[in-house]
Amino acid sequence: MLNLPSLALHDERLRRVASAAAKGGGGLLGVGTALAGTAVGLAAFQAYQARRTIGTPTIAPPYADGRYLPEGKSAVRGVSLRLAVLGDSGAASLGAEGAGETIGATLAADLADASGRAVILTNAAVVGAQSSDLAEQIERILTLRPHVAVIVIGGNDVTHLVRPSTAARILGDSVRQLREAGIEVVVGTCPDLGSVRPLGAPLRQAASKLSRDLAAAQRAEVTAAGGRPVPLADILGELFYSEPEVYFSADQFHPSSAGYRAVAFALLPEVLRAAGISSDVPALPSGSSSDSAA
């Protein structure tokens, strides 16, 4: 669950970021000599405002589990591909308007089309989950023996101030457990929380730095564990930042249906490779210009 006051008040790194910002380009609140302590107080107020704007989720993510067939086919022969999705509210697609617009459903449908086989989707993601919650999710899906597992995790580790090295190590252990079970793993690393518009400076800069630090640590751990990392912040950060009205849902924190399609398209090339399917699928949704992503 979102924990912005904790991020604002208790992270010593925020004090350093705020201090550096004050000494650099004009300072905070237009005062170049603003003190870091004042910046932290400002960040606490911004966290309060952001939490009021974002609110608490009152609806569940769309349920999209099921069997997906290639487009235009009512039945197919052969063994179905099994796809599992693990992680937090992003993986669960909280904010998507319908089941067909979730990350899991988009990936399952595209995987079915590309492979010509049926795809069985199971989503075990939990809203508010941190990396430490992956173990329980893995237990839920191991008996299903998925061919590919997709993990999207990290935002709640940042807002709850879990050390990047700790969160990344736990993620690496989770990937290793899945790989030892013969499951291919694709991981969408922590998105750039600095693109969340309700966060003002200096809180936005601190959130961006912390989330990108975690993403870098995740990428290293996932690679070492035999997984396939996808740097969501690098691919989609600028897209979400420049067009928040398109890619964020009404709460301005979770992605919209368009946002989740963008995330799914970023993940799709590695998902296809993990399933043994060669593809030149672009990492951005159709209609998005290549210069919109960092």
Give the role of each language-model region.
Residues 131-168:
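Oxyanion-hole/transition-state-stabilizing segment in secreted/luminal serine hydrolases
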Residues 181-183:
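A short helix->loop->beta-strand "cap" motif at the edges of active sites that frequently abuts
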Residues 1-82, 279-294:
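N-terminal secretory targeting modules
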Residues 48-124:
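Serine-esterase "nucleophile elbow" of acetyl-processing enzymes
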Residues 93, 123-130, 155-166, 203-207:
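Surface-exposed cleft-lining segments at the edges of enzyme active sites
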Residues 85, 151, 186-188:
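Structural beta-sheet core signal
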Residues 194-294:
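Catalytic His-Asp segment of secreted/periplasmic serine-dependent ester chemistry enzymes
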Residues 90, 154-157, 192-193:
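Short glycine-rich anion-binding loops that position phosphate/pyrophosphate groups of nucleotides
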